[in-house]
């Protein structure tokens, strides 16, 4: 089974968590694209979706899935999204696709977070994948200096502007032993919009695509 086939298996497995006549929160990325393909097969049975990125919005519109603005929606039963890394406590690093802020907002609204990954994303300790931090452009140098004080090596992700008009600093060499605390610490830095640690709001269900099929962890 290739990595993409494992992603596809996890994406399609998430369909069973989608309730009829509901509005579904949809994340961003290669694994989520498989979920969107799956969601399109039951678009007549759901009201529609709320998207965490312009890319996912476009894909859903192309497939005929109605997309709602989050401000017009009071509740979401589920949010389905991938992760760049996830540990045994369901803490994640996300934001490789630079959509972390909108992902975190939609996840906060949803009753249940369903994380879909292939088995290469499971780790014991978070931090080998660089931690993305979304930053107001004028604060880039200041935020970078503060991140160095926290033990990281921030690198400006050149050529990338987020859907919110901001920039990304990728923080390398962080051994993240207390994700909840670090998430809060970084978010307190003036100029930070948010960071890619999803620990204070982690996943509720993890669907892992593997050579042996999809494993469910709760």
UniProtKB/Swiss-Prot annotation:
Among the record's GO biological process terms, what is one?
A: D-ribose metabolic process
**InterPro entries annotated for this entry?**
NagB/RpiA_transferase-like (IPR037171), Ribose5P_isomerase_typA_subgr (IPR020672), Ribose5P_isomerase_type_A (IPR004788)
Where is the catalytic site?
Answer: 103 (proton acceptor)
State if S-adenosyl-L-methionine is listed as a keyword. no
HAMAP family in alphabetical order: Rib_5P_isom_A
Function, as annotated = Catalyzes the reversible conversion of ribose-5-phosphate to ribulose 5-phosphate.
Pfam families found in the cross-reference section: Rib_5-P_isom_A
Please state the span of the N-terminal signal peptide per the UniProt entry.
none
| Entry binding sites for substrate | 28-31, 81-84, 94-97, 121
Write down the top EC class of this protein.
isomerase
Q: What is this protein called?
A: Ribose-5-phosphate isomerase A
Q: Cite the annotated pathway.
A: Carbohydrate degradation; pentose phosphate pathway; D-ribose 5-phosphate from D-ribulose 5-phosphate (non-oxidative stage): step 1/1
Report a single Gene Ontology molecular function.
Answer: ribose-5-phosphate isomerase activity
């Amino acid at each position: 089974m290739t990595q993409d086939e494992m992603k596809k298996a996890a994406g399609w497995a998430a369909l069973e968590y989608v309730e009829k006549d509901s509005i579904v929160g949809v994340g961003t990325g290669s694994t989520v694209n498989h979920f969107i393909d799956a969601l399109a097969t039951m678009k007549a049975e759901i009201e529609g979706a709320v998207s965490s990125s312009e890319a996912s919005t476009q894909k859903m519109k192309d497939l005929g899935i109605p997309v709602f603005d989050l401000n017009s929606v009071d509740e979401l039963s589920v949010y389905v999204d991938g992760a760049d890394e996830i540990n045994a406590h369901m803490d994640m690093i996300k934001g490789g696709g630079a959509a972390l802020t909108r992902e975190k907002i939609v996840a906060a609204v949803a009753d249940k977070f369903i994380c879909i990954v292939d088995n290469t994303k499971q780790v014991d300790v978070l931090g080998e994948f660089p931690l993305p931090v979304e930053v107001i452009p004028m604060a880039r140098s200041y935020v970078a200096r503060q991140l160095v004080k926290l033990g990281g090596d921030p690198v400006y992700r050149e050529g990338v502007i987020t859907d919110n008009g901001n920039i990304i600093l990728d923080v390398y060499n962080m051994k993240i032993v207390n994700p909840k605390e670090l998430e809060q610490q970084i978010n307190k830095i003036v100029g930070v919009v948010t960071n890619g640690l999803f620990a204070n709001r982690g996943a509720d269900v993890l669907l892992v695509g593997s050579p042996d099929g999809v494993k469910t962890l709760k």
